[in-house]
């Protein structure tokens, strides 16, 4: 039987903190991707989605100190920068919305706002490498 490697005791609390932050980040992502219409739903209005996105990312930013630890400092800094950049892109989109020109433009804008949050994948991978 294969056993999953355990996270070191000193990283359990930071890992729980990361999970709490990721829950907010995922809710923010879901808010933005909900703007894209599907065959069954028209898509959330962009202004409404941006407000929800910013609220969830602000919540994520407030939770960030919970997972800061020397072993994951580089990843923590990357995630902090990713949140700040995504919030800045959302602010610019809210204050000066571009002409989207249809479905492709909307997809591009959503991708641009979400791209900095890819840093969280590196953080999750770092925690996986720290298991013993």
PLM region spans:
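Long, low-complexity or tandemly repetitive, helically biased scaffold regions used
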Residues: 1-132
């Amino acid at each position: 039987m294969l056993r999953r490697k355990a996270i070191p005791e000193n990283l359990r609390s930071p890992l729980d903190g990361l999970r709490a932050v990721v829950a907010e980040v995922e809710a923010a992502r879901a808010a933005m991707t909900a703007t894209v219409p599907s065959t069954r739903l028209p898509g959330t209005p962009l202004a409404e989605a941006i407000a929800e996105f910013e609220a969830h990312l602000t919540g994520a930013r407030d939770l960030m100190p919970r997972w800061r630890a020397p072993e994951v400092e580089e990843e923590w800094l990357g995630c902090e920068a990713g949140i700040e950049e995504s919030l800045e892109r959302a602010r610019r989109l809210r204050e000066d919305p571009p002409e989207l020109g249809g479905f492709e433009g909307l997809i591009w804008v959503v991708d641009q706002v979400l791209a900095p949050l890819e840093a969280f994948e590196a953080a999750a991978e770092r925690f996986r490498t720290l298991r013993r």
